Amino acid sequence: MEISGWGRYPKIDAEVILPKTGSACASALKDPGLLIPRGLGRSYGDSSLASTVLETTELQYFQEFDPETGALACDAGVSLYEILNVFIPQGWFLPVTSGTRFVTVGGAIASDIHGKNHHVDGTFCEHVLSFDIALGNGEIVTASPTQNLDLFHATCGGMGLTGIIIAARIRLKPITSSDILETTIKAPNLDAVLDGFEKYIGSTYSVAWIDCLAKGADLGRSLLMIGEHATDGGLKVSSKKPITIPMDAPTQLLNPLTIKAFNALYYGKVLQTEQSRRTSFETYFYPLDQMLHWNRLYGKPGFLQYQFVIPTATGREGMRRILEEITESGQGSFLAVLKAFGKQNENYLSFPVEGYTLALDFKVTPSIFKLLDRLDELVLQYGGRLYLAKDARMTELTFKASYPRWQEFEAVRSKYHAIGKFASLQSKRLGLA
């Protein structure tokens, strides 16, 4: 069957295996040949693509929950959406969440997802107590911060290349309201929004929408959104049905003129320098989940999400230079999200380092690849790197120059029988065995 990542580029024909139990996952590994595990397919590029794909979505059961500690044990195919639906009414929330709820627990670990609170709470895997993983030889073992630590650090952020996560134990955090108290600050330029991140470093959540086509004195103008959990107002999950994008949009829908017009309207909708509101967790964390199949907006060719991080020391200069490159190209991004990262963790391939990260969506066109190659050069020049969960075209040279622990990662893969069993289109492109 034809499959792709969320960006719908590239698309390939693959054999898809759907085991219903962890032991069935392990049994599937006895067959010769390479494969890659896959959850709900929300990584954007080719990290979960291979000629043989093992989907974990049938591993979908909750196992145990401790209301005293918030420790949840569940199958790896359980989604963040399902966790929120079950546990928000009981007063619990995810410790870290990505910009979509439609991610499996296994996928969240494999990508070591981050959220709007990285500067406070780190990545998802920093709240993982342990997981069970089927190795390339069919053995099922447990990895945690106290057991098989090297396997734990390699699997967290390891893009499914160490084995098949079949179950996990994570720690949820208590809340007394499902609502978010949001303050939006209008930042007239890049320096102002980066100053805002520093000013609100003690806030639990922070994220900025950035106008990537603004030039001159307006370069980097943004809306910075600060969030805190409300303490009253009930614990509820919306029953409102999302709208559906029914078909591919015309390829000319998103172009520099429409993006520029949208950006002007979006920035202009905030009339005051600072304004506050109470909003639902769905609106604050998952605005795009309100549109099913929103990836169709980019048309049949698909799109590339380009997310990079630049360390704090070079962050301002690097961000400015990259934004200038984008505005000069005229190839703007319809969605541009800026966040501040806290300290780096010990996982070999986890993306975040302390600094600033920007995520951009670009429609697939013949000219976009040249621009992204140029942005790669700038990211490396300023000491940054790209997010593997979003990547579909990074070179081996760029990867190995920006992820200095890749050889340690490969050594752990060899130790735990992953080499010769787990591989994706991405891992082959990046020169991993």
For every predicted segment, state its role.
Residues M1-A433:
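Noncatalytic alpha-helical scaffold of FAD-dependent oxidoreductases
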